[in-house]
Amino acid sequence: ENKQEATQPAVIEKNGHKVTIFNYMDSDNFKEYSSDVMPVAGDSSPGYSAWDDVESPKQISAAKENGSDFIIVYMHYGNEYSRSPNQMQEKISHKAIDAGADTVVGSHTHVTEGIEMYNGKPIFYNLGNFIFDQSNTATHRAYFLNFQITGDNVTSVVYPVDINGYLPHFMSSSDGRSLLEQLNPQCPQMKITDDGTGELSFSLNSTENYTSPSF
C-alpha cells in the first residue's frame, strides 16, 4: 500500500538459518515510463520498491543487525540485451554488499551477464529469462541458482538452462559448460563441473579484498 510496505523484505527461517530477501528496482533505468504505467511506491501510495542509495543500504544493514544469517538482494536493473553490467549496476551491487548483503541477483536484461566476486561475495548480474519466450536466440540461454548453506559457508550452484516454449530446460553438459565459460572470466573462483553446472563457494564471514574485473 505504500513505500514502507514495498521495502519490507521476505524473511524465511529454515534449518536454523534466517534468510532475508530484499527486492528493488533501479528507477533510473525506467525514467521513460510515466508514473501511471510504472509507479514508485510513495508514503501513501502503492508501487514498486525503488533502490535508494541512502535508504536501501540502511535497510540491508538493519537486517544484518537483526540477526539475518543470509541476505539476498534481488535487483531489477541493467540495459536490455546488454551482455555486460553498466556502471549503475556495479555501483548498486557493491553498495548492497558493503551494507551487509551476502549476494546480489539481477534480472531484467533478458540475457545473461557476468558473475563477479566482490569482497568475497558473489554478484550474479543477470540470470537471463526464465518462464519467458522471445525470438532472439540470445535470450534462450539463462541460468538459475541454488544456494546451499552449511554453517558459515555457502555454495551457489549455477544451473544453465535453455528456454523453449516458455519453459526452461536443463542444458546438456557441453552447452552448460559453454555458457558458464562465457561468464567465468569475470569470476575465476567458479568451478565448472563435468555435468555442465557451476559451483561458487564463499564464506558468510568473508573479508576478501576486492579486485575489479573487466566486463
Give the ranges of each region predicted by the language model.
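Acidic, metal/ion-coordinating pockets
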Residues: E1-F215
